[in-house]
Amino acid sequence: MRGALLYELGQVPKFGTIDEPTVQKEGQHAIRVTAAAVKNLDKARTSGKHYASYTDLPTVVGNDGVGYLEDGTRVYGQGITGMIAEHAIISSNYTPIPKNLDDVTAAALPNAILGSAMPLIIRARLEAGQNVLFNGATGVTGQVGVQIAKHYGAKEIIVTGRNKAILEQLKALGATQTLVLTEDNDALEEQIKAIHQATPIDVVIDYLWGKPFQSILNAFKGNDINHLTSTVKIVTAGDMAGKEIQLTSAILRSTDIQLMGSGFGSLTKEELIVFNKVILPEMFLLAARGKLHIQTEAHPLEVIEQVWNKTLDPGTRLVITL
């Protein structure tokens, strides 16, 4: 079969042929793939620097995708084998796709939903009427997250980012306040303090970590013994601005901050089933009705090597079609 093959860690996958995978045990399903998104996770695994980097080479790359089961059902699934190929093997934890949702959109959405709905709904337990801050919201996942927060009834949706044009677009998607990130982290801290005093922030979804997140933490710090706190649930879902922060004991002792992470390692098997069987079907229906949007750029499998590292428009997901 044809596929996107990785021959060496740190190299770009190439178009080639490899043996078609077969079902090995009960609970596995063969899928004829029609579309698969290229995500940061996929690139990290091919780099050799990710904890889940590929080991047996050559191999088909791609973590998830869309296609048809042997009975003709069109589904989204996460691959037991690589998904950017004509055929793959997935588990029973797949999600049927509505008829009026196209393959490219269905392939592009799940990772962004995983990175936004799971932090919001599963980790932070967002409730209608709460105020949410997305730190680093101008990427694909942040843009989807803003729409999901609005869908679930968030009152104030504050977003940060460097791309002013995307920040303006986020207002149309549900953002109520936008903050432009610069190198002046002290200014960000003061802005967050002012917002938090006026409309207490209940949930923070952070995609950046590093210095911008450090400023947000500092903004929540209580400054006197009579400080009256409100609970702030902070979920880290990325580290695009840095791998480390400086967390002092005083920050955690002076206010009620609940700091947690969201990612494959922090989500239980049961939570991932909820994602595939409850959350994702709901989001697919929203997208099919035109109420959840994602920007995509699609290219055929044959040009995988040329487009793998292509610079896309901000907030756009690359999708490979087969």
Please place each PLM-identified region on the residue numbering.
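Active-site capping/gating segments
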Residues: 257-275
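Short, glycine/polar-rich helix-capping loops at beta-to-alpha or helix-loop-helix junctions
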Residues: 83-84, 161-169, 244-249
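C-terminal hydrophobic helical "lid"/dimerization subdomain
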Residues: 225, 270-322
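NAD(P)H dinucleotide-binding glycine-rich loop of Rossmann-like/cofactor-binding domains
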Residues: 61-64, 74-136
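Mid-domain Rossmann-like dinucleotide-binding core that forms the NAD(H)/NADP(H) cofactor-binding site
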Residues: 110-184
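Glycine-rich cofactor phosphate-binding loops and adjacent beta1-alpha1 units
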Residues: 173, 177-257
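Glycine-rich beta-strand-centered segment in the early N-terminal region that forms part
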Residues: 21-39, 47-82
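Conserved beta-strand elements of the Class I
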Residues: 29-30, 133, 235
